[in-house]
C-alpha cells in the first residue's frame, strides 16, 4: 500500500539512486525527491548507454545491420531480429517458407521464456528471495544452449534473416526442445510455490505501482504493462505475423494493474509459450528455411562448389548486399517487454536511409514517476523490477 501519513518533523531532500546500483537493472540514474521515506517525485535520467545504434545502421547493409538488434534488449535478442526481418520482407514483398515461419515463432517464444524467467528471478532477488534466481538460471541455461546449437552464440544469436532464418535446425534439437517443454511447466509450478501465495512476496507487490487502464493508454504502455491493467492487447492476436494466426493460445490480462498482477501475467505467458512451442513442433513441415530468391538469399555451399555464377552471387550478396525497393514501412512484434517496432525508410539502395526503433521500455520508464509517488523507497525497487527495463533498448 502507498504510505501517505507524514510526520511533522519530516525533512524533504533529494536522493540519487544509481547509475551503479544493482537494483536499477542497468545504468539508470534516478533523482528522487523524498519526504522522509516517501517518494514525492522520481526523475529518471537516461542516455548513459547510448551508442548511436540508429545512426550506425545507416552505414551498414541490411544484412550487416541485423546484429545491432541483438544488442538492444540483450535479454530477448531474437524478437528484435524478428521485427527488423519483417520490415525488410514487407518492402521486398518476399514470401517466407512455412518451415522458417514456424522456426521463428518457436524461437520467439523460447526468447519470451528466457526474458520472463530472468525478470521474475531478479525481481524476487531484489526483494530478498535468492532461490528463484538459482532455479530459473538453471532453466535459462537450457534455452541458451538451444540458441548456441542453432546459431553458434549463446546471447547475440544473429539467426533471423530477411526471408527466413540463417540455417536449419541441427539434428536432435527438436527432441531436446520437446523434452524441455515437458519438464519446464513443473519448474514454473515450483516457482509459483515459492512466490504466488507467499505472504512477504504479496506484501511487497500487491497494490504497488498501480497503473489504471487510462494511464496505460495515455502513456503508450504495451505488453505486460498494458495487459496488467486489464487491456487485452497482444500483437500476436490483434495483428498476427508469421504463423501466430494459426496457433491456439490465450492472452492473460490483469485486474488491478499492480506489480502482483504483472507477475501473474508473466507466469501465465510462460505456460502459453510452452503451448505455442509444442504446436510449432507439431505443425512444422519439412522444406526450405529461407526464400529461394537468388537476389536476396545466398546460394547453398554445395552450389558454390559447382557453379561460378553461384560463387559470384554469394560474394556480391555478402560484400554489397541487395537493394531494397524505395518505400517506408512500420513492422512490430510482441516482444517479451511489449511492442517492439521498426520504422524503416528505404531510398532504393543497399543501406537503410533511416531506421527508427520503438523500444517498449522507453515508454514504461516515463511512467515511473506517477507509479512511484506516495510509495516508500523500498517499493521503488519493486516498481523498477516490474517495468522490466533493459537500457540497451532504451538508450539505443
Swiss-Prot record:
Its main location: membrane. It is a peripheral membrane protein. Keywords: Cell inner membrane, Cell membrane, Membrane, NAD, Quinone, Translocase, Transport, Ubiquinone. PROSITE patterns: COMPLEX1_49K. InterPro entries: NADH_Q_OxRdtase_suD, NADH_UbQ_OxRdtase_49kDa_CS, NDH1_su_D/H, NiFe-Hase_large. It is an enzyme of class 7 (translocase). The keyword Transport applies. Transmembrane segments: none annotated. It catalyses: a quinone + NADH + 5 H(+)(in) = a quinol + NAD(+) + 4 H(+)(out). It is found in: Cell inner membrane. Its EC number is 7.1.1.-. GO terms for cellular component: plasma membrane. GO terms for molecular function: NAD binding; NADH:ubiquinone reductase (non-electrogenic) activity; quinone binding. SUPFAM superfamilies: HydB/Nqo4-like (SSF56762). Gene3D superfamilies: Cytochrome-c3 Hydrogenase, chain B. NDH-1 shuttles electrons from NADH, via FMN and iron-sulfur (Fe-S) centers, to quinones in the respiratory chain. The immediate electron acceptor for the enzyme in this species is believed to be ubiquinone. Couples the redox reaction to proton translocation (for every two electrons transferred, four hydrogen ions are translocated across the cytoplasmic membrane), and thus conserves the redox energy in a proton gradient. Belongs to the complex I 49 kDa subunit family. NDH-1 is composed of 14 different subunits. Subunits NuoB, C, D, E, F, and G constitute the peripheral sector of the complex. HAMAP family: NDH1_NuoD (MF_01358). This is NADH-quinone oxidoreductase subunit D. It comes from Orientia tsutsugamushi (strain Boryong) (Rickettsia tsutsugamushi). The lineage of its organism: Bacteria, Pseudomonadati, Pseudomonadota, Alphaproteobacteria, Rickettsiales. The gene is nuoD.
